[in-house]
Amino acid sequence: MSIQSLLDYISVTPDIRQQGKVKHKLSAILFLTVCAVIAGADEWQEIEDFGHERLEWLKKYGDFDNGIPVDDTIARVVSNIDSLAFEKMFIEWMQECHEITDGEIIAIDGKTIRGSFDKGKRKGAIHMVSAFSNENGVVLGQVKTEAKSNEITAIPELLNLLYLKKNLITIDAMGCQKDIASKIKDKKADYLLAVKGNQGKLHHAFEEKFPVNVFSNYKGDSFSTQEISHGRKETRLHIVSNVTPELL
């Protein structure tokens, strides 16, 4: 990834603060935040801690003459930037750094950011829906929602931002929706969606067509894996089947 290209993208983010009262440059705060989050930070205090630990390295690329801002400052500044403009900037930078190849698996999933809930301000937790490249271990794009229940509307927005042609898109049961499947097809990609009780008729059709005994004697293409998880041995069976009318 090019650090200079990240700095170039960050530098065009509008700063709406009163310049006479500014101690830390916006570009420095955003650079610190992006680097810390990439390194695994998901709380404001963790971003500040990352800054103190990596201050000498950060100084090579940004203006940190006034040191590292405290977590409250980071939270306030990041919360007040144009989130849509920053989101667009970040996705463009990630796509510049990462070339998606045909046949890649892209996992779409939601995550609630720890520490984003503010009871005093009656502010709900922030929920992010992200597209993750399994091949390269990077997030290709993300969309913010106010609640996990809004994933259904956020996923199509995220799909619109990405180039997905000839890739496989995986989504959990929340994304098992006709509109989402159609959107993926429109993007010339394939999909692998989980089917659970939220799709009652479809779930019932799958259970009837694929009872457990079918898997143990399946005659078509299949694959199985075994692993120990949470103290129990799990066997996962995968089969390839043609789509029949009851599954449409």
From Swiss-Prot:
Cell cycle is among the record's keywords: no
Keywords: DNA recombination, DNA-binding, Transposable element, Transposition
Keyword DNA-binding: yes
Gene Ontology terms: biological process: DNA transposition
Protein's UniProt name: Putative transposase YncI
Family according to the record: Belongs to the transposase 11 family.
Organism taxonomic ancestry: Bacteria, Pseudomonadati, Pseudomonadota, Gammaproteobacteria, Enterobacterales
Miscellaneous information on this protein: Missing up to 50 C-terminal residues compared to orthologs.
Single GO MF annotation: transposase activity
InterPro entries, alphabetized: ISAs1_transpos, Transposase_11, Transposase_11-like, YbfD_N
Source taxon at top rank: Bacteria
